[in-house]
Amino acid sequence: LIRKGHERTVDLDQFYTADGIMPHAMESHELLKEIIIPLNNAQSAYKRLAYRSAIDYPIVCAGVLLRPSDAQKIQIDEARIVVGAMGRAPLFLAQASSSLKGKNLDDTGAFQKAADASMDSAATFAVHNVGSTLEYRCDMVHLMVFRALKAAAEAVQNSNG
């Protein structure tokens, strides 16, 4: 973030505040200069569900980052699961994310459990802000997280890094 005569760096987990009045740490006189994403062999995937995919606010969305533990790309060293359109800000799901550490990249059972945990966690923070039921949106969190996990795992396995 920059402003006249000053520049500062804010970690992403500190940038979003979950405050409806001040939803992020950027102040009115600051500009976003750059976003730095250190990948280190990690791959990501994003899935969203909307009534009309090109123009609508999503009913629910999920973003996943998976970093393999070694060059063989067998196990997960780090996972980050974030869901959007459920709360007042994107929700980083720490418990669901950490449950994948050490799991194999082809372990769909572990992905199902992480998707279950994601659904439960997101339901806690859910707000009624779109034209669908809360139950449906929670079910879709599970589906979007599971699909994003599978897509990110496939991207890791197919990457050249």
Give residue spans per PLM region.
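C-terminal structural segment of proteins
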Residues: L1-G161
